[in-house]
Amino acid sequence: MPIRNAVFDVGGVLLEWNPPAVIARLHPDPATQAVIRQQMFEHADWHEYDRGGLSHDDAIVHFAKTTGLSTDDTRALIHATRESLAPIAGTVRLVEDLARAGVHLYLLSNMPASTFEFLVQRHSFFSHFKYLVISGQILLIKPDPAIFSHLVEKTGIVPAESVFIDDLPKNVVAARECGFEAIQFRDPDSCRAALRGYLPTFS
């Protein structure tokens, strides 16, 4: 089937995602950095925050307890992490070029609702997407097949006519198991080249 739709992840694809760099900037001590990584960003509870099972305020209190940081320092760290989500210029150009080519664009991201609300006010390129699925808004999260089913049910897109782009292998595998074509994102240029395999007239 011809590809009509492209479904993008956000963190690590459209926007930079590098928590260790943010942690190191705010907390120079290596031992503290390790605790924050392990007890916050790499912990299953961060996944739950992404899923919407923890509100923003509850997450601040919770991660202050697990990391030993003050609530003010935890709040500052989460805010700094949001601020660090800068656009990846080559991917933004790719989105703009796909939109001009008539490809239907969708978003499917693991992200707290409050973080997405912060980002959508900052970046105009989100307007290129016809429908946006944010895990924290619907209590579903990749790689659960249910979040892909949610996208299909809400939009009516055909998975076999859609290519999903994500930086994490487990999410790429999940998308393929749900019938989508899929590309593991490494950088904008290789992603563009991979898309040409699905969209021969796209440059």
Question: Where are the language model's segments positioned?
Answer:
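Active-site neighborhood of HAD-like aspartate-dependent phosphohydrolases
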Residues: 1-42, 66, 177-178
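Short, acidic loop-to-helix structural element flanking the phosphoryl-transfer center
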Residues: 75-106, 117, 145
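Metal-dependent phosphoesterase signature
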Residues: 49-90
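Short beta-strand segments
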Residues: 16, 106-110
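Generic structural signal for small/hydrophobic residues in well-ordered secondary structure
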Residues: 9-12, 52, 107, 132, ...
